[in-house]
């Protein structure tokens, strides 16, 4: 697979599903089989370009501790996802999963070469820790915005109390006004919808709503909510 990259990628496109099943069912050899898996990613120049988990790790930032992925029906949808905004800002690669089975496989692996595998829509990602420590730049914010924003968060939290777990300031959003993220340990929305298709009684879990205090729409809402 390593020495004949093009030939292996052709093989993977034809028989990759079989190897994926091996990762899922052959627990003893799952780490070896995981080396044979191939993915597209945010750093790939085209939807046809593939890379291995080992190649992903080799390209990780020096202080990056986790492997990240996002799941959607196609690459175009993932490119527009608000979950990717912080990754673009930090220039961190994200694996693109379009096969519904891929996320089950990666969540089953848990880690690769001692690097935890995490979905980009999870609440507490390691790459967000530095953002938590940064002092918020308030130079372009309206006067007395801090109190207005806190009041807006409380209002939204009360309004959506029966539909969300929490409402808080986001440290991942750059361009979008808000997003919903999964609490730790909860499958992604994509996987939960797949589960719901086979189990009508399955209820999709409540999410955490994150609000981007820098977004103009949020600032206007805060002013109107005063």
Say what each PLM segment does.
Residues 1-226:
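Conserved GHKL (Bergerat-fold) ATPase module
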């Amino acid at each position: 697979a390593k020495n004949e990259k093009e030939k292996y990628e052709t093989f993977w496109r034809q028989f990759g599903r079989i190897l994926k099943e091996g990762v899922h069912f052959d627990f003893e050899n799952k780490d070896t089989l995981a080396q044979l898996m191939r993915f597209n990613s945010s750093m790939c120049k085209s939807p046809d370009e593939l890379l291995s988990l080992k190649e992903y790790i080799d390209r990780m930032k020096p202080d990056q501790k986790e492997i990240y992925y996002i799941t959607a029906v196609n690459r175009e949808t993932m490119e527009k996802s608000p979950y990717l905004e912080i990754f673009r800002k930090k220039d961190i690669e994200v694996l693109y999963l379009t096969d519904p089975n891929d996320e089950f496989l990666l969540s089953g692996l848990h880690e690769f070469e001692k690097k935890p595998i995490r979905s980009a829509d999870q609440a507490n990602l390691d790459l967000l820790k530095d953002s938590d420590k940064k002092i918020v730049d308030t130079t372009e914010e309206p006067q007395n915005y801090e109190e207005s924003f806190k009041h807006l968060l409380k209002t939204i939290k009360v309004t959506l109390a029966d539909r969300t777990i929490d409402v808080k300031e986001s440290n991942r959003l750059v361009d979008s006004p808000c997003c919903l993220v999964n609490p730790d340990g909860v499958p992604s929305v994509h996987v939960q919808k797949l589960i719901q298709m086979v189990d009508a009684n399955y209820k999709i879990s409540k999410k955490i709503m994150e609000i981007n205090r820098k977004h103009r729409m949020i600032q206007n809402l805060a002013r109107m909510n005063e």
